């Protein structure tokens, strides 16, 4: 496969998961931040819940977050030290990142991460909970807990929760090189 690469399997994510359980109020917390505008939920329909640790930003109201390099740590960033340890050890130059939760039986349809921000970034997933199918272009894999993967987010990609529990994955971007 050229658009999905398994980096490692069997990573112990139990401490990361425990911190998620300890701070359930962090899910969706970026919606309550001052001076933060969320994309129109009628235009961007999804059943995914988000816990952003480093989110994109804009400097002007008419700017698209996909076309800026602005990265802002959310208040939840400080609480989730276990995932930060993982990132600092393995990918210390990470940029935007967060946890995504997909309910049982749900899917995220094929989409491309658009904007200049993504042109020089690699995107990774670390699976925290549940089993899911991930598809990129015409390739697909089944992802289990503790799997770290890279994928080409510049072509259509999406996911289906195959498990009997909410799928949680940690998504993060790293500049090329």
Please annotate each region the language model reported.
Residues 122-127, 148-150, 164-177:
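A short hydrophobic beta-strand segment most commonly corresponding to one strand
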Residues 142-156:
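Conserved metal-binding segment of the jelly-roll/cupin
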Residues 159-163:
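Asparagine-centered strand-capping/turn motif at beta-strand->loop junctions
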Residues 98, 125, 158:
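Short, surface-exposed charged micro-motifs
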